Amino acid sequence: MATKGVAVGIDLGTTYSCVGVFQHGKVEIIANDQGNRTTPSYVAFTDTERLIGDAAKNQVAMNPQNTVFDAKRLIGRKFNDPVVQCDLKHWPFQVVSDEGKPKVKVEYKGEEKSFFPEEISSMVLTKMKETAEAYLGHPVTNAVITVPAYFNDSQRQATKDAGVLAGLNILRIINEPTAAAIAYGLDKGARGEQNVLIFDLGGGTFDVSILTIDDGIFEVKATAGDTHLGGEDFDNRMVNHFVEEFKRKHKKDIGQNKRALRRLRTACDRAKRTLSSSSQASIEIDSLFEGIDFYTAITRARFEELCSDLFRGTLEPVEKALRDAKLDKSQIHEIVLVGGSTRIPKVQKLLQDFFNGRELNKSINPDEAVAYGAAVQAAILMGDKSENVQDLLLLDVAPLSLGLETAGGVMTVLIKRNTTIPTKQTQSFTTYSDNQPGVLIQVFEGERAMTKDNNLLGKFELSGIPPAPRGVPQIEVTFDIDANGILNVSAVEKSSGKQNKITITNDKGRLSKEDIEKMVQEAEKYKADDDAQRERVDAKNALESYAFNLKSMVEDENVKGKISDEDKRTISEKCTQVISWLENNQLAEKEEYAFQQKDLEKVCQPIITKLYQGGVPGGVPGGMPGSSCGAQARQGGNSGPTIEEVD
């Protein structure tokens, strides 16, 4: 079937959602069954049915307590989050806590039901999926969904879960401003490097991202935003203003009447839009409360005054993003407006003044740009080879830390999670026993302290290392992730030039994205155990290193004559005793290793001090050399030689 390769891009917005598809070399933004290219992110429950989109929003005044919107302001948040608590005051529907998670409570077909925000969002996503299917004429399962750039892990994971609940295979979650930048970049077809600032102010969220776009490569330099700022907040200010006016004029408080408030909010939203093109808007609501008609007006100046702090607040993230990107405002080539709220003249003026009167770029449709970019990214991920997208590259991040196993089964991280890819990191390691002929390089991904708790990606042997005492050979290990997320690991022994490498692709052996998120969540739960284990291994390695270093130092030719045979024998025997104790106590507690270390220091320190005063070449080993020390490989499971980290 020729249709299997189609994937859609969905902008799941706070107030409106939008879906697009890339086919025949261009993006189509798909209109819904009402002929609208954006669909309200509303779900309503009635005595007989569930309504989604326009149908839900159209009946909101008659059924305010069972019409749910703003799920995006709840998703991935805790019930006691101050943001949620603040929003509760404005919502006509009821939100309750279910083990700390917010749930929306409604009446549906005469019964009380409660839904998680993910479930509400999944209903909106289902509507977008059906809109695309009606247009394309076949089922759609693959999708790219967008989220605000500063959405945290739980918000992203919850959004992804919503996609799964809607029966979608989420190819990727991408950031809204980045998606908008793709729309801008394709639209412009610009050549040469450009620093672009995306200013995305929507219905409920605000993002600022700075990207460098160069010949189809979109690299995010910095992002900032406000998790809770958008058109809804401007509506709230206007609603509060008119509630006060109604009180003054009619001596009645409509604040507790959900239906009246909802009708007023709808009128305020309409007035706000009118004020973007006119200097005054009128509000006429028949029988708003207790039979009283409410006829009034608001000027643009008054609206701007009501929201002045919110409007000014949009500039802080702009400044922060510029600082993080290490760019001056004069180095930004284009300031691109995205999101319906950027139509507000005052917002535009503040931004323009901040950039010293520069023209703002309004070339892309602010309501559709994000879905447009998501559709392009969906096509790329499905392997679309159209000439205008085949060279397009979005620089993503590595979702999990990558590293290798060092002495004692410790996970030594070379690439931290959330590092932009492509990236390359090199670190030096050494052997852990004398004349060791080879090392086993084992590559892991995960957030745990010990490799046994992480995911083994692959391993290879670097052999042919020239005979040398432990700690002498220098083995350089390089982790290199390319833009496809393909990891190449190479190792080279510096003196002999011997090298070997392995390629690890993001394929069947890797964890699914679900596992990734699960691991990150688990990692926090296990963090305490991890820390204790890391300290235990550090103490063991420190003791072993100290004992070996002392032993080899007193046996050194250069020390002959500077130390009596008796002292030499004392140190040598004590070190041998400790090394033998270590071999039999691989799994001792941190405190036992610390005790052994103190005991060893007590015996050796006076002799070392004497030696010091006599002046000794090469210095004296330190007490706790941290992670530069060797240890036996963890017992069981792992044959093959180990390697250890060098500071």
UniProtKB/Swiss-Prot annotation:
Disulfide bonds: none annotated. CDD domains: ASKHA_NBD_HSP70_HSPA1. Residues 622-647 are annotated as: Disordered. It holds the Pfam family HSP70. PROSITE patterns: HSP70_1 (PS00297), HSP70_2 (PS00329), HSP70_3 (PS01036). Keywords: ATP-binding, Nucleotide-binding, Stress response. One of its GO terms (biological process) is protein refolding. One of its GO terms (cellular component) is nucleus. GO terms for molecular function: ATP binding; ATP hydrolysis activity; ATP-dependent protein folding chaperone; heat shock protein binding; protein folding chaperone. It comes from the Eukaryota. Belongs to the heat shock protein 70 family. This is Heat shock 70 kDa protein. The lineage of its organism: Eukaryota, Metazoa, Chordata, Craniata, Vertebrata.
